[in-house]
From Swiss-Prot:
HAMAP family (alphabetical): Pterin_4_alpha (MF_00434)
NCBIfam families for the chain: PRK00823.1-3 (NF002018)
Family stated for the protein in its record: Belongs to the pterin-4-alpha-carbinolamine dehydratase family.
Taxonomic placement: Bacteria, Pseudomonadati, Pseudomonadota, Alphaproteobacteria, Rhodobacterales
Protein's name in the database: Putative pterin-4-alpha-carbinolamine dehydratase
């Protein structure tokens, strides 16, 4: 089972994601990012690729898609905040984008 990020490693894990455009969600222990692609097909391909990893890791994003834009929020509901699963999925999403 995932564990909530502890204070000693939290900044270390989040810093690279913040530099890559992820932001903290106000009022929640969660991160968010907006991905913009060339068109709907590219956005949907990104979501499909992400979905395969999310299923493999049993960790699913909160997300929405409008045309070429995908808005993503990551948190681990089971632990009530951010976990290493969120860091792992955010990094994978950046690589897929």
């Amino acid at each position: 089972m995932a564990q909530k990020l502890d204070d000693s490693t939290r900044d270390e894990h989040l810093a690279p994601l913040m530099r890559a455009g992820w932001e903290m969600v106000e009022g929640r222990d969660a991160i968010k990012k907006t991905f913009v692609f060339g068109d709907f097909t590219e956005a949907f391909a990104f979501m499909t690729g992400t979905a395969l990893w999310a299923e493999k890791w049993d960790h699913h994003p909160e997300w929405s898609n409008v045309y070429k834009t995908v808005e993503v929020t990551l948190t681990t509901h089971d632990v009530g905040g951010l976990s290493e699963l969120d860091i792992k999925l955010a990094s994978k999403m950046d690589n897929l984008a």
